[in-house]
Amino acid sequence: MSETSKQTSVEPEQIVTDDNALRAAETILAARYGGTPRLTVTETLREKSRNRVLRCAVEEATTDSPVSVIIKSVDGEGENAYDPDNDAPNGTGWRFYNEWAGNAFLDRLNLDPPVSTGLIGGDRVAGLIVLQDLGSEGKSLADWMLAEDRPALLVALRSYAASLGRLHAETIGKEELFSQIRREIGGTETIQELPGAKMLRESVPGFRDLCAQVEEPLPPQFDAEIERIRAIVDEPGPFFAFTPGDTCPDNHRLTETPYARFFDFEFAGFAHALLTAAYIYLPFPTCWCVNRLPEEAVTMMENEYRKELSLQCPSAKDDALFYPQALAARAFWTITTLSWGKGAVEGEDDTWGISTIRQRNLLRLDTFADATEKIGEFPALGDLSRRLAANLRTRWNLAEEMPLYPAFRITANETKSEGAK
């Protein structure tokens, strides 16, 4: 049976309880492997209003069946309750179809080593998918980011960047296959607003308001450079590839191979690859585990990413094409994240994960301004970012840089001590 075949084991009006999810998942396993499998929940990995993720032991399994699986189910609540016939952009159903189609699409490519978890099957009506269980002992990049083992972190950073490059390289030119799979499982392929156009509508007004609030004038070239960013992001040309949509450092599993296996595809689809690669530079604009990476680590990650991407995308070797496009992607995320809460100018600073919102905003402004000078593109926005960072740093009385990740602090501190002697 195809991994994208529809199942109808749960009535549409039923709320998916754990028992309902287990019965639906058992039907999927039986269709795939035969027998009469029974599932027992051994661990709840995530339980939020949007979705639940369960680890389950497989009992009475056939020889071919795995002994443990992962169930990911979508629920939603209120107006966002899951409806299999509602594929409106950004809704619960839309995220579910992205998740299922993303996993099925990557499985269909039959890559060795694999780049995703491995899909067993899904149930459209119940709103769940069953995935291979990669086990509970492995690590992600986030684990090493919190540790003090520098060699291990460098290996993890290299694997993360190479894996992104490989994922993008292997999926360029295959957007119709992804769309076909999404239709097969019940998605209606509603037109999604392009990210650059969405930035113009949602983020740029907030960024303008932030600048006005702190009395930082916009340069005359502001609108022209913003339009250029929109055009690059929405017209990716050779860089049009599959992206998971949320490549935070804990949304994958590092493996014994040089490559990671990605998961969490709720926002997956085809877009400008460098919007995802921008996570290397900023770093990680939508994630909780943000500190600062030393420049040599960023350069290493960039080289690994470009090396893998260029295997299927020769344009990635062209500095004159790659760097302006990558910088536009960084500008997109800088403007987008600064517009959230208008940069948290007033009131108390908020901590998210291992750093504060203000620390993140200053880091992104600083790194973007530095990059505009180095690459020689978007000079007006680069100058504005430099001025805005200085303005906010004074207002917030934040003189110190964002801390380095723990594994890099030891070397930095030792260097400072040696210099003081």
Identify what each model region corresponds to:
Residues 126-138:
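Conserved short submotifs of the Hanks-type protein kinase catalytic core
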Residues 1-125, 220, 235, 255-260, ...:
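Conserved NTP-binding catalytic cores of kinases and kinase-like/nucleotidyltransferase enzymes
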Residues 242-244, 249:
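Catalytic-loop of the protein kinase fold
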Residues 275-314, 328-348:
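Active-site activation/catalytic loop segments of kinase-like enzymes and analogous catalytic loops
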